From Swiss-Prot:
Active-site positions on this chain: 73
Subcellular location: Cytoplasm
Any matching Pfam family: Maf
Record's keyword terms, sorted: Cytoplasm, Hydrolase, Nucleotide metabolism
Assigned EC number: 3.6.1.-
Annotated protein name in UniProt: 7-methyl-GTP pyrophosphatase
UniProt-annotated site: Important for substrate specificity, residues: 16, 74, 158
GO cellular component terms attached to this protein's record: cytoplasm
Broad class of where this protein is predominantly found: cytoplasm
Amino acid sequence: MTRTSPTLVLASTSRYRRELLARLRLPFEVLAPNVDETPLPGETRSATALRLSVLKAQAAAMTHRDALVIGSDQVLMLGTEQLGKPGDHERAFAQLKKMQGRAMVFHTALTLLNSRTGSVQTRDVPTVVHIRPLTDAQIEAYLKKEQPYDCAGSAKSEALGIALMERMESPDPTALIGLPLMALTEMLAQEGVDVLTWPAT
């Protein structure tokens, strides 16, 4: 990829991923991938996330033949149960009630696909989050202030949701929000893109 080549392509409709990628100050395009997100029989949740991140990148690459395409997917596990986006206040309260005082694991899958060469890099970046013991009143107060109904686990770590958390363990703190920038920086370097010296937007 030369410096006159097309920009990066982010295969995601998530505004959180767009905001994260913008931190690297690289020009990029956004494309909404159309993929079937149904898990395969016997597939672990982390394997599903990794497979979907690849499928999203491949879908975007179909219309971008000379680009570096970023695909990402995330699953949240509380023990053996997968937690999704609550969608409303009642489900969000139930999620936080179940999560309080416990540890949960976010698996954030990342794919970087070079649509010109066909090379594919993938990474699963886990983040363990320990939620504080919470009272019902605290949960209600948080939900009224933040309304995190579009976030898996009903907590926005980049905002007030950080107050729900006791500690977290991750090799890449941006993975929790949905796009592991440290891992992505390494992947881009493998494709000849030095984030620090590349022309900024």
